């Protein structure tokens, strides 16, 4: 998987068309109203639903106010630079409420749980789970077969563009409510205890805990048993 360069992300945001998409429920004498091709109009003579840019739909509503009895607007963003990721072709389990921006890489059989937030440029490896309410900032990278616990934060780095992003290597377990600061690498097979604040690189196959996090021991069989990654949670339906 390719990590986006910070300057690529900055350029994408700068050049993107800022959008305020809306969904509008409308009723009235709609046979008298003409809708442009740039607005998706699913209407009959008396009612319907519109999808499009707010500035354009507002103009339609204002210019046809004598024909429109009532309308309700649904709107969840304003001048948004980054669309949501199109999830339909992704071979992963993504639960309702996850917020995933465009230009995020998600490996096969990954799991993204409810209300996780994943920003532009983040990378999630095959078979990794991002648990409820976890946050992956811009360009944060998670390797294969990892678990990022509920409420954990992997700090994002888009500006300054020279800053190094968070990198979590393969087979890492990060506990609930952990904070990993910018520039930190968590080494392969490491375990970060719940609530830790990680300010420095974590050596491979070690357990760290505390604020700031410190190595408390090397991985042993007991730790492996307590932090086992269950592949059964990552299985998808067979393709048809």
UniProtKB/Swiss-Prot annotation:
Q: Which Pfam families match?
A: DapH_N (PF08503), Hexapep (PF00132), Hexapep_2 (PF14602)
- Which BP terms does GO give this entry? diaminopimelate biosynthetic process; lysine biosynthetic process via diaminopimelate
The answer to whether UniProt assigns keyword DNA-binding to this entry is no
Q: Which InterPro entries match?
A: DapH (IPR019873), DapH_N (IPR013710), Hexapep (IPR001451), Hexapep_transf_CS (IPR018357), Trans_hexapeptide_repeat (IPR050179), Trimer_LpxA-like_sf (IPR011004)
Pathway this chain belongs to = Amino-acid biosynthesis; L-lysine biosynthesis via DAP pathway; LL-2,6-diaminopimelate from (S)-tetrahydrodipicolinate (acetylase route): step 1/3
Offer an example of a GO molecular function term for this protein: tetrahydrodipicolinate N-acetyltransferase activity
What's its EC? 2.3.1.89
Q: Which UniProt keywords apply?
A: Acyltransferase, Amino-acid biosynthesis, Diaminopimelate biosynthesis, Lysine biosynthesis, Repeat, Transferase
Superkingdom classification of source: Bacteria
Cystine pairs = none
What SUPFAM superfamilies does the annotation carry? Trimeric LpxA-like enzymes
Catalytic activity as recorded in UniProt: (S)-2,3,4,5-tetrahydrodipicolinate + acetyl-CoA + H2O = L-2-acetamido-6-oxoheptanedioate + CoA
Checking HAMAP family in the record gives: DapH
Write out the similarity annotation: Belongs to the transferase hexapeptide repeat family. DapH subfamily.
Query: What PANTHER family would the database entry show?
Result: 2,3,4,5-TETRAHYDROPYRIDINE-2,6-DICARBOXYLATE N-ACETYLTRANSFERASE, ACETYLTRANSFERASE
Q: State the protein's purpose.
A: Catalyzes the transfer of an acetyl group from acetyl-CoA to tetrahydrodipicolinate.
Q: Give the protein's recorded name.
A: 2,3,4,5-tetrahydropyridine-2,6-dicarboxylate N-acetyltransferase
């Amino acid at each position: 998987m390719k990590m986006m360069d910070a300057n690529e992300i900055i350029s994408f945001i700068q050049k993107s068309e800022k959008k305020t998409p809306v969904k509008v429920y409308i009723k009235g004498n709609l046979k008298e109203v003409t809708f442009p091709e740039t607005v998706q109009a699913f209407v009959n003579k008396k009612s319907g639903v519109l999808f499009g840019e707010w500035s354009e739909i507002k103009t339609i509503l204002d210019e046809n106010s004598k024909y429109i009895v009532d309308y309700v607007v649904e709107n969840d963003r304003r001048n948004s630079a980054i669309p949501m990721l199109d999830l339909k072709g992704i071979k992963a389990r993504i639960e309702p409420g996850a917020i995933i921006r465009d230009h995020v890489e998600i490996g096969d059989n990954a799991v993204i749980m409810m209300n996780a937030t994943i920003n532009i440029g983040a990378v999630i490896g095959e078979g990794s789970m991002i648990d409820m309410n976890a946050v992956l900032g811009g360009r944060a990278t998670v390797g294969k077969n990892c678990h990022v616990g509920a409420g954990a934060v992997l700090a994002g780095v888009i500006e300054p563009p020279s800053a190094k992003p968070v990198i979590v290597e393969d087979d890492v377990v990060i506990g609930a409510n952990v904070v990993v600061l910018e520039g930190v690498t968590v080494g392969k097979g490491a375990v970060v205890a719940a609530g830790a604040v990680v300010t420095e690189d974590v050596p491979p196959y070690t357990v760290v805990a505390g604020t700031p996090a410190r190595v408390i021991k090397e991985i042993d069989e007991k730790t492996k048993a307590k932090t086992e990654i269950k592949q059964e949670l990552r299985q998808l339906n067979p393709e048809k």
